[in-house]
């Protein structure tokens, strides 16, 4: 009686007795191990029968390795030949995971923010399979070609609205020090009214110069026009946008402006100042807003001149939204939409204090995005009405029919 038959009978006995067949102490792992090694021996026999006729190639020992399967860990003894021409198919060279379902599960757990330690513990507990951090990393690296293809895909020629903002993380540099990295994100609304992440870009810091590179990349990938760009108050950002998309309307985030203003107002005045400021950004039109800004300055200008000056200096960019309908104003007066996306991403990345590499950061953020975008199947509420308003406003730049 050979070992394969013994393992088969053991599996059958455990099945009848109700014992576990899978994972730790299960009978299927050793049975699978026998089957795989027998198949490899058969492959080598077939390979040598062809080689020996021409070159006299012979066996040259075996190479042992551990392979993870959904039934547990198995030891594979891969035969070797003297000429090194044997290429096994049953278990390929350098293959350490023999179950696409297992690899997919690892990637899915990683995409949900599960730590490598918890992933390893789960597979050890459920399948008696030992996964090192390097193994998990190599499995999740399978998504890297997908990221490359996604980052270079062609885009639509026109987007109705785009929000541009950065999210920051800590990453180890080449010397092992934790440094800040910014991921620049461009979240857009296409002509169908659906959210779309046009791109994400890793850089050492947020700045207008790098945003210029980002916008140029969008142009190179087919974007010809963005009707409205919504941004924070980064200096030089509007100029960077209009150097690439000169017809775009640029709206500075009102919420950012308010936050920055309040920082320089004394705590005992903040409540009253905010109430007065609300009459400016909450006005019915731009003329009314300008009149209320004059009133704000007459009351608070001597006490907080720098705050008032900031509103004056950025006035045209801060008040772009007044030329649109209330429904469109609600979408563009703040970068809340992209910040909401960032909050969803952080729910996944919050378990990572410092990322070991830029690649590991980009990999996890992309996987988080891949799950988030599954919900972006429907257009914005009342998009039919909004798209008509945009078509009337922008004419030939936004044809919907």
Positions of predicted regions on the chain:
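Basic, short loop/linker segments at the boundary and entry of helix-turn-helix/winged-helix-like folds
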Residues: 59-112, 128-141, 208
């Amino acid at each position: 009686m050979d070992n394969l038959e013994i393992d088969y009978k053991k599996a059958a006995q455990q099945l009848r007795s109700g014992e576990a067949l899978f994972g730790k102490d299960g009978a299927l792992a050793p049975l699978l191990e026998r089957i795989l090694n027998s198949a490899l021996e058969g492959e080598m026999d077939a390979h040598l029968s062809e080689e020996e006729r021409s070159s006299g190639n012979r066996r040259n020992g075996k190479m042992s390795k551990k392979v993870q399967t959904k039934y547990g860990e198995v030891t594979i003894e891969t035969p070797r030949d003297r000429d090194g021409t044997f290429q096994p198919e049953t278990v390929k060279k350098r293959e350490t995971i023999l179950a696409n379902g297992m690899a997919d599960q690892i990637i899915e757990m990683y995409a949900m923010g599960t730590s490598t330690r918890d992933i390893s513990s789960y597979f050890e507990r459920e399948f008696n399979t030992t996964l090192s951090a390097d193994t998990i990393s190599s499995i999740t690296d399978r998504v890297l070609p997908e990221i490359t293809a996604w980052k270079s895909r062609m885009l639509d020629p026109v987007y109705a609205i785009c929000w541009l903002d950065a999210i920051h993380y800590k990453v180890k540099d080449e010397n092992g020090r934790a440094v800040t990295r910014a991921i620049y994100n461009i979240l857009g609304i296409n002509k169908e009214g659906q959210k779309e992440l046009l791109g994400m870009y890793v850089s050492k810091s947020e700045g207008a110069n790098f945003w210029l590179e980002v916008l140029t990349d969008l142009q190179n990938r087919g974007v010809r026009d963005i009707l409205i760009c919504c941004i924070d108050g980064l200096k030089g950002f509007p100029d960077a946008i209009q150097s690439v998309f000169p017809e775009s309307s640029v709206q500075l985030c009102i919420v950012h402006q308010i936050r920055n203003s309040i920082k320089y107002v004394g705590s005992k005045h903040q409540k009253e100042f905010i109430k007065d400021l609300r009459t400016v950004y909450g006005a019915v039109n731009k003329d009314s807003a300008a009149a209320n800004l004059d009133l704000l300055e007459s009351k608070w200008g001597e006490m907080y001149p720098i705050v008032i000056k900031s509103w004056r200096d950025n006035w045209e960019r801060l008040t772009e939204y007044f030329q649109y309908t209330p429904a469109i104003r609600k979408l563009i007066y703040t970068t809340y939409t992209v910040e909401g996306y960032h909050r969803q991403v952080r729910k996944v990345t919050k378990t990572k204090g410092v990322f070991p590499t830029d690649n590991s950061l980009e990999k996890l953020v992309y996987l988080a995005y891949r799950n988030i975008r599954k919900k972006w199947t429907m257009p914005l509420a009342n998009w039919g009405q909004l798209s008509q308003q945009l078509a009337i406003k922008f004419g030939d730049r936004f044809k919907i029919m």
